[in-house]
Regions:
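Structured interaction patches on ligand/partner-binding surfaces of diverse proteins
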Residues: 194-216, 553-581
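Short active-site neighborhood of thiol/selenol oxidoreductases, capturing the structured segment around
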Residues: 610-638, 651-655
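A short, amphipathic beta-strand motif
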Residues: 134-145, 175, 482-495, 589
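Short, internal strand/loop/helix patches
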Residues: 668-703
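Hydrophobic/aromatic-rich core segments of domains that either
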Residues: 1, 9-19, 24-116, 187-189, ...
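Short, ordered, surface-exposed loop/turn motifs in non-cytosolic proteins
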Residues: 135, 143-162, 183-185, 386, ...
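Secondary-structure boundary elements
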Residues: 1-24, 243-245, 254-419, 429
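Short, acidic Ser/Thr/Gly-rich low-complexity loop/linker segments typical of extracellular
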Residues: 159-181, 510-535
Length: 737
């Protein structure tokens, strides 16, 4: 039933509500699992969401569902049904996991390790249910070797080119803290009172790790780190051919039910007709209405009313600044409130930072009319003339209590106004919302997380000054800045490192480092900031102490990382080296595959060999699982590097296990795939079986499978299952051939 309603598609970090996911007919894993848990609970089946904060062997994370059946928890892939429980495409990745979390209502006294406790819920570690584990103990001492009590200890996994904190503990009176995790490597970071120390912990190998707080935020140096993830050891329940056939039949039926609903969404032709009838910009209107999916009626009603009120241009501007996900679930009340209570747009800055209802990842609400009514005219004018007065008002009137909002869900701006109590994040969103309601451009900087506003200069927004908001400071200031330049000596397979894929920057605050969130481009596709457009010619950063992390992910999942610490000084340029470490191993023959193996090319009735299709030389062969998340990731990764594969020029043969599987494949979901691809059917699963046997894969059913081989029947690369960055891994090997 859940698969009838929702399938997987990547999206931004805000989690849609269960009913919003139904309306859209798709969602990312966190939304699929939230929806499925809600559905199971609604019919009396105990259920919970389980997630890994970050994978260790590949970038990204994942969430799924556990249901309570006959006195035991069983897992499954949310809206991705398998014939039996305890089976999903993620069995193999989960066996390589470091941590798995879930939440339990209230206090908890069970056997699982407690990760985090609040008055409302307890977060527990359920990694023992999925992978072999070991306990790692950490002793934190000062420079004299004395144990340090109440030091903060962060356990970090390398993922998306940063060391991401997956667990935070505090040392006891003897200076100890511990964690149970999968048998791989983490970076452990300890800090207290401005001093810090760190070291690599290999779970299952290191019984106790000693960390000395002997570092401070002034030292400049660089060091390499080799990070090894847990080994794979998937335990897969048996599925009979009859069960698989019946499951495939049901999934096809469920697809047809969902697709019948999706067919009711507005079409491009209907959207174009609507735009013409209302004299709207055709290109933008069509794009916005198609993107709204099941919410298209809300947008057409809103635009129709805006045309009648002679506000069509501003209405389009409003829809352009909200997120793609907002288009799919925004309410008429929100759109009308912000259209009718924001003044007239004067610039791009106005649209983004006054008209825009969204501040961070909160549920957007209709707050502008409320604030215009509640704030006395004299105060409103004083705030506009001097936004510092609004900062002071917030400091005086809003009490901060981070303990009361234990679920960390942002309060609405109106809720903060009425309660006069909020957590820090909700207070920050409230300040920006209130400022925008008064016509003051304000925002939370996406890179640094700083709250900022722009002053008026003779009513000219463009010439106003940008100030940082510090609720602890007596006066708001413009932060002093310096410039960071990074030198990079290209390695053969990488001319322009990407942010999140190959490197990140973090700023030192309160004893630890906080990531700078530069643009990542399309979700799940990398893109965005790179070395050449960010650091080659220099970028301005606030003064302070920083860390650059770089990493080369190997096909095994291991990482060759490098960490560089440096300081940015006011008005000065700091130059560092961006080091991408390389494996010293040359491309090696790791197995065999018969290039005379045959498959059935799509659109033909005669089998053809791989050799006939590809000619002499190297080629890529893959067996795909249509509609499955790991295959979708792989195809998006390949599309992202389409130009590289075109330049290589060799054939890629992408096969499906059956004609039925091929019919489920929608190439339009993966724009930009290279023209060198040939699609076909792996008749009777012969090629899939051969790859699994010759490469000694632990399970022959996990898809996708990719190999790079040649017509001498040698294999130099193999990948199976869920891998982020597959396209890049393929190109690394190709560059080494």
């Amino acid at each position: 039933w859940c698969h009838e309603k929702v399938i997987y598609t990547p999206s931004d970090a805000r989690t849609s509500s269960p009913l919003a996911s139904v309306k859209t007919a798709y969602g990312r894993c966190g939304e699929e699992s939230t929806f499925t848990v809600a559905a199971l609970r609604s019919v009396g089946i105990p259920a919970r969401q389980v997630y890994t904060p970050r994978w260790a062997h590949t970038d990204d994370n994942h969430a799924w569902v556990e249901a309570w059946v006959d006195g035991k928890w069983y897992f499954f892939g949310a809206c991705e049904p398998e014939p039996v429980l305890n089976l999903g495409w993620f069995n193999a990745p989960a066996s390589r996991g470091m941590l798995m979390h879930t939440k339990v209502f209230g206090r908890y006294t069970g056997q699982e390790e407690i990760m985090y406790e609040t008055p409302n819920y307890t977060e527990i570690n359920v990694i023992d249910n999925y992978a072999p584990t070991a306990k790692g103990s950490v002793l934190v001492t000062d420079a004299e070797g004395q144990p340090v009590a109440d030091a903060t200890v962060e356990f970090k996994v390398y993922n998306y080119a940063e060391f991401y904190t997956v667990a935070t503990k505090h040392t006891d009176r003897s200076g100890h803290a511990s964690l149970t995790a999968g048998k791989g490597d983490m970076l452990v970071w300890a800090s207290k009172d401005g001093r810090f120390g760190y070291s690599k912990l290999s779970f299952g190998k290191d019984n106790e790790l000693k960390i000395t707080l002997d570092k401070n935020a002034s030292e400049t140096y660089s060091l390499p780190l080799d990070i090894v993830p847990p080994a794979e050891g998937a335990n897969l329940p048996e599925v009979t051919p009859e069960q698989r056939t019946e499951n495939d039949r049901r999934m096809a039926q469920e697809d047809s039910i969902r697709n019948a609903y999706v067919a009711t969404f507005i079409t491009e032709e209907q959207a174009r007709t609507f735009a013409k009838e209302n004299k709207l910009d055709e290109t933008e209107t069509v794009r916005l209405l198609i993107a709204s999916r099941g919410n298209h009626q809300t947008l057409t009603d809103f635009l129709s009313d805006a045309v009648k009120a002679d506000k069509a241009g501003q209405a389009i501007s409003l829809l352009k600044v909200v997120s793609a996900k907002d288009l799919r679930d925004v309410s008429p009340e929100v759109l009308n409130d912000h259209l009718n209570n924001s003044g007239l747009p004067a610039s791009e800055d106005f649209c983004s930072n006054v008209l825009n209802p969204r501040v961070a990842n909160e549920m957007i609400t209709p707050y502008k009319a409320f604030f215009r009514k509640e704030i006395p005219a004299s105060e409103a004018e004083a705030f506009r003339k001097n936004p510092q007065a609004l900062v002071e008002w917030c400091k005086k009137e809003i009490t901060i209590n981070n303990e009361l909002n234990s679920q960390r869900i942002p309060m609405s701006p109106m809720g903060v106004w009425k309660a006069r109590v909020a957590d820090e994040k909700s207070r920050n969103i409230f300040f920006v919302s209130m400022a925008r309601s008064l016509g003051i451009p304000a925002w939370i900087d996406e890179v640094t997380g700083k709250i900022q506003y722009r002053t008026f200069n003779d009513n000219n927004l463009k010439n106003g000054k940008v100030y940082d908001v510090d609720f602890e400071a007596a006066q708001q200031t413009q932060a002093p800045t310096g410039t960071l330049v990074a030198r990079y000596r290209p390695i053969p397979s990488l001319s322009d490192p990407k942010y999140y894929s190959h490197f990140t920057l973090s700023k030192f605050r309160n004893g630890t480092f906080q990531l700078l969130n530069y643009d990542e481009g399309d979700v799940d596709m990398g893109g965005g900031a790179t070395w050449s457009n960010l650091l080659k010619n220099g970028t301005r950063l606030d003064t302070g102490y920083y860390m650059m992390v770089t990493g080369t992910r190997m096909a095994s999942g291991a990482v060759l990382a490098n960490v560089t610490f440096f300081t940015i000084e006011e008005g000065k340029t700091t130059t560092v080296d961006l080091v991408m470490r390389e494996s010293k191993d040359q491309v090696q023959v790791i197995g065999n595959f018969n290039s005379e193996s045959t498959y059935l090319p799509i659109g033909t009735s005669e089998p053809q060999s791989i050799l006939q299709t590809c000619g002499r030389g190297y080629y890529v062969v893959a067996v795909l699982g249509a509609g499955q998340e790991p295959t979708n990731h792989a195809l998006r990764d390949i599309a992202a590097l389409s130009g590289e594969f075109e330049k290589w020029g060799r054939k890629m043969v992408l096969l499906f296990p059956s004609e039925e599987q091929y019919k489920k494949f929608r190439p339009s979901e993966f724009p930009g795939l290279p023209s060198t691809i040939t699609y076909g059917i792996d008749v009777d699963g012969a090629i899939q079986k051969q790859i699994a046997e010759s490469m000694k894969l632990p399970n022959s059913t996990i898809l996708p499978m990719f190999i790079i081989g040649d017509t001498f029947n040698r294999v130099v690369f193999v990948s199976q299952g869920y891998t982020i960055g597959l396209g890049e891994q393929l190109m690394k090997v190709i560059h080494g051939l």
